[in-house]
Amino acid sequence: MIVRIYPSEISGTIKAPQSKSLAIRLIFLSLFTRIHLHNLVLSEDVIDAINSVRALGVEVKNNSEFIPPEKLEIKKKFIKLKGSGTTLRMLIPIVAAIGGEVTIDAEESLRRRPLKRIVEALTNYGISFSSSSLPLTITGKLSSYNIKISGDESSQYISGLIYALHILNGGSIEILPPISSKSYILLTVDLFNRFGSNVKFYGNKIHINPNNLVEFQGEVAGDYGLASFYALSALVSGGRTTIVNLWEPKEYFGDHSIVKILKEMGATSEYLDGKWYVEAKDKYSSIKVNIDDAPDLAMTIAGLAAIAEGTSEITGIERLRIKESDRIESIRKVLGLYGVGSEVKSNSILIFGINKRMLSSPITDCLNDHRVAMMSSALALVNGGVITSAECVSKSNPNYWQDLLSLNAKISIE
């Protein structure tokens, strides 16, 4: 797919894309209780989660209703994922808790992602692994209810262990510092407690005392990280937008911080009663911000930093190298295509903002990374541009291009 973008000014109201982080967690909750998700958007990552719970015995009706099995067991000996890192990293400890043997594989982008920490941890508790990367055969059953794991590689392992210890009727997790993306662990803890469980997270320890979980019926709330590209598009193009279907920002949840970050850079950016109001200003300020707790915000911040006055610095970027693409290099490449300079340091990237009228009109290949396409499309609204392999947005937000059209973006899709 090729998308051609012409100079446009964004305006209008748009519904935030559903949170894939929340959708995947809700789908995995169907291992324990009935879940009915209204109007579920079937992004590639969500489909990976659906196929995973189906392989563990969950009955799935119309890709929206999920009925737990009487007994959890591995129904399929081979689970093929597409590209969902969240699904993969949560699935590994879950199948280890159920016990048996299963092989997991995925597309090349996921094969490149490290699994070292979860393999190291579970090897100490009765699980055998064929390797520390995909394709991966997992054999055995967790032999302990008290797990130690390093927290530096991915928070998704810890979220998966919370599910695993619910399968084992309780236990504890000790996370060896540093703890990356702690807010996503807190999201999982909060979700289980909302459904009636008893999960406590103090310092670096999580204690799980399961209760019967209540059923859920409703729609998945919007995703601040994905919605931020609509906000970025409005700010870069000189427009305004209102983004709806967002839950109230939590103090702990990193992605919500984008509302405040854009405001600190000089934009009108306010949340009120489920709506995020965004309006462009004539100029934006540079910023220094640490994104270790919310790495998915890097490209939105980089996009606005490209046209901000002065030099911005995004720190805490180490884990950007193990996303769908090497996002540190992807940010540098996209910025360079638009004529914006940048410099990578040991754990930060400097972005040297320019007047937006000086932005180039390049051709950008999305590098099989949905956020590359979204960042580039926002910058292209100033002087135009072309996105190739533009179908990559289907990983998280299949409706992205149509949404831009509804916001008065001038684009053609080939």
UniProtKB/Swiss-Prot annotation:
Monomer. It catalyses: 3-phosphoshikimate + phosphoenolpyruvate = 5-O-(1-carboxyvinyl)-3-phosphoshikimate + phosphate. This is 3-phosphoshikimate 1-carboxyvinyltransferase. The keyword Transferase applies. 3-phosphoshikimate binds at K20, S21, R25, S154, S155, Q156, S181, D296, K323. GO terms for molecular function: 3-phosphoshikimate 1-carboxyvinyltransferase activity. Keywords: Amino-acid biosynthesis, Aromatic amino acid biosynthesis, Cytoplasm, Transferase. GO terms for biological process: amino acid biosynthetic process; aromatic amino acid family biosynthetic process; chorismate biosynthetic process. Its EC number is 2.5.1.19. Catalyzes the transfer of the enolpyruvyl moiety of phosphoenolpyruvate (PEP) to the 5-hydroxyl of shikimate-3-phosphate (S3P) to produce enolpyruvyl shikimate-3-phosphate and inorganic phosphate. The gene is aroA.
